[in-house]
Amino acid sequence: MVKDTLFSTPIAKLGDFIFDENVAEVFPDMIQRSVPGYSNIITAIGMLAERFVTADSNVYDLGCSRGAATLSARRNIHQPNVKIIGIDNSQPMVERCRQHIAAYHSEIPVEILCNDIRHVEIKNASMVILNFTLQFLPPEDRVALLTKIYEGLNPNGVLVLSEKFRFEDTKIDHLLIDLHHQFKRANGYSELEVSQKRTALENVMRTDSIKTHKVRLKNVGFSQVELWFQCFNFGSMIAVK
């Protein structure tokens, strides 16, 4: 695993964070050291796939990055005629994802596409994964995407939505942000790295509250919506059609 040192030296002109070649190269290390509970979420996606994925259906991993969630789901699917479609708009991520998936043999076909998830049809789905993806979409596009997902899910299908959250109580919000930064420092990131990455993400990652997520998912039509995992200001929800 290549170590993430992208923000370890001062950057004179710090632009917006993008999922380019450099990020794709170090992404597994970056996300493990940056997202509290990430491994637990990936493992549980497999457990949810085992329960929810049905025969003759599709599984979508929207914003699949290097394929961790896709592989976790695939390892735990025991139904016939299932196909997994992973989609990411970063070509470097897609190339590495394809290599990663190909390294593990399975009877379940996986197709990895380089595309904008807003422009991809969702159909005959028993499971859709949005693992730290929605937060990078413009807020005005989120309802349309979730509506498309809901309409493309079969009855009793599940959406797994993992996100970084903001909290309406300012003191709690600041506390959890501080704890997250402490988590990153404990994982070897310097103050400079934490600060520069936060600045780079400011304009591209817009977080919502748990309440906002729940209300939006209910309004789209999901019958059951629940937060099943949280660590500091990161967490994951399930929404069942």
Swiss-Prot record:
The keyword Transferase applies. One of its GO terms (molecular function) is S-adenosyl-L-methionine binding. InterPro entries: CmoA, Methyltransf_25, SAM-dependent_MTases_sf. GO terms for biological process: tRNA wobble uridine modification. It comes from the Bacteria. Its EC number is 2.1.3.-. Catalyzes the conversion of S-adenosyl-L-methionine (SAM) to carboxy-S-adenosyl-L-methionine (Cx-SAM). Belongs to the class I-like SAM-binding methyltransferase superfamily. Cx-SAM synthase family. This is Carboxy-S-adenosyl-L-methionine synthase. It comes from Haemophilus influenzae (strain PittGG).
